[in-house]
Regions:
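Basic nucleic-acid-binding interfaces
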Residues: 1-20, 28-59
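Short aromatic-glycine-enriched beta-strand elements
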Residues: 24
């Protein structure tokens, strides 16, 4: 799955982002939820972990 699609879906769900050196941190209600690596394509197993950590269906 493309990184920009993950960011877009999380933003629609109310997440805000903080850019780091190699990752983007996702927060909701001021609480840190997950980290998204700076890769064009995110592996399926990582997408599943992001879904579990955020509670947002991405696929």
């Amino acid at each position: 799955m493309k990184r920009k699609d993950i960011i877009r879906k999380l933003a629609e769900a109310g997440f805000v982002f903080e850019e780091g050196g190699n990752h983007t941190k996702a927060y909701k209600d001021g609480i840190y939820r997950t980290t998204i690596g700076r890769h064009t394509e995110i592996p399926e197993r990582i997408v599943m972990k992001i879904e579990k950590q955020t509670g947002v269906k991405l696929r």
